[in-house]
């Protein structure tokens, strides 16, 4: 895959992520903050971005979303087959809730 293709795919992922994040924040800010792992400050900014600002941010050559499964226990919980899927999801949610939210610091 060529470098220009990779950059284009990063921009597409960024735009899709920003559009989803903004929609989640506008529909239910508290739930969005939990699902996205962002602070109220970031959620407020996401909610106010214009379409032009979203496109400009998405044009970055860096991936804007962060892989939150940096905890081995969490990743193992989500990738192993469990007899009780609901308990597995609840355990994953508890582990994610322990992680600090991202801020503008």
UniProtKB/Swiss-Prot annotation:
Principal subcellular localization: cytoplasm
Cellular compartment(s): Cytoplasm
GO BP field: bacterial-type flagellum assembly; positive regulation of DNA-templated transcription; regulation of bacterial-type flagellum assembly
An example Gene Ontology molecular-function term: DNA binding
InterPro entries: Flagellar_FlhD, FlhD_sf
Gene Ontology CC: cytoplasm
Top-rank taxon: Bacteria
Keyword tags: Activator, Bacterial flagellum biogenesis, Cytoplasm, Disulfide bond, DNA-binding, Transcription, Transcription regulation
Domain notes: The C-terminal region contains a putative helix-turn-helix (HTH) motif, suggesting that this region may bind DNA.
Role this protein plays: Functions in complex with FlhC as a master transcriptional regulator that regulates transcription of several flagellar and non-flagellar operons by binding to their promoter region. Activates expression of class 2 flagellar genes, including fliA, which is a flagellum-specific sigma factor that turns on the class 3 genes. Also regulates genes whose products function in a variety of physiological pathways.
Family under the similarity heading: Belongs to the FlhD family.
Oligomeric form and interacting partners: Homodimer; disulfide-linked. Forms a heterohexamer composed of two FlhC and four FlhD subunits. Each FlhC binds a FlhD dimer, forming a heterotrimer, and a hexamer assembles by dimerization of two heterotrimers.
HAMAP family noted in UniProt: FlhD
Protein name: Flagellar transcriptional regulator FlhD
Gene that specifies this protein: flhD
């Amino acid at each position: 895959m060529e470098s220009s293709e990779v950059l284009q795919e990063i921009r597409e992922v960024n735009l899709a992520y920003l559009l989803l994040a903004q929609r989640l924040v506008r529909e239910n800010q508290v739930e969005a903050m939990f699902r996205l792992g962002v602070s109220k400050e970031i959620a407020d900014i996401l909610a106010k971005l214009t379409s032009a600002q979203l496109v400009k941010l998405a044009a970055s050559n860096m991936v804007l979303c962060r892989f939150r499964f940096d905890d081995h226990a969490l990743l193992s919980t989500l990738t192993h087959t469990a007899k009780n899927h609901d308990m597995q999801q609840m355990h994953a949610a508890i582990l994610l809730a322990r992680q600090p939210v991202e801020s503008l610091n």
